[in-house]
Amino acid sequence: MAGWQSYVDNLMCDGCCQEAAIVGYCDAKYVWAATAGGVFQSITPAEIDVIIGKDREGFFTNGLTLGGKKCSVIRDSLYVDSDCTMDIRTKSQGGEPTYNVAVGRAGRVLVFVMGKEGVHGGGLNKKAYSMAKYLRDSGF
């Protein structure tokens, strides 16, 4: 879906993100657009199911994966109507840096952003929330 790439480009334009993606979570459960070569490009339907699933506690204990990358859930407000976001942090494997990730939920898509090293999760959360709200208000 080439039209969705412009949304990813918009999320990336201020330089604080290393990756962004728009991912369908309803009937078209796959990555619609993502930063080329990134982890988000490989997000699977099973990983989407964990994020949107009914079990809102298990991932706090067990973590989750995004494109095969292990992550910890910091805060889950994905189904809180006034918020619709989730804050995640990648886990270090082999000593590499960890990164903040924010997810925003619109009506049919999830917005993913991953910050560069040292980028605070609060700014990423606001970015994911704003894009998800825009898409929700636009019928997505």
UniProtKB/Swiss-Prot annotation:
Disulfide bonds: none annotated. InterPro entries: PFN (IPR048278), PFN_euk (IPR005455), PFN_sf (IPR036140), Profilin1/2/3_vertebrate (IPR005454), Profilin_CS (IPR027310). Signal peptide: none annotated. One of its GO terms (molecular function) is actin monomer binding. The modification N-acetylalanine is found at A2. One of its GO terms (biological process) is negative regulation of ruffle assembly. GO terms for cellular component: cytoplasm; cytoskeleton; glutamatergic synapse; postsynapse; presynapse; Schaffer collateral - CA1 synapse. Pfam families: Profilin. It comes from the Eukaryota. It is found in: Cytoplasm, Cytoskeleton. Keywords: Acetylation, Actin-binding, Cytoplasm, Cytoskeleton. The keyword Transferase does not apply. Occurs in many kinds of cells as a complex with monomeric actin in a 1:1 ratio. Interacts with PFN2. Interacts with ACTMAP (via N-terminus); the interaction may facilitate efficient cleavage of the acetylated N-terminus of immature actin by ACTMAP. Belongs to the profilin family. Binds to actin and affects the structure of the cytoskeleton. At high concentrations, profilin prevents the polymerization of actin, whereas it enhances it at low concentrations. By binding to PIP2, it inhibits the formation of IP3 and DG. This is Profilin-2.
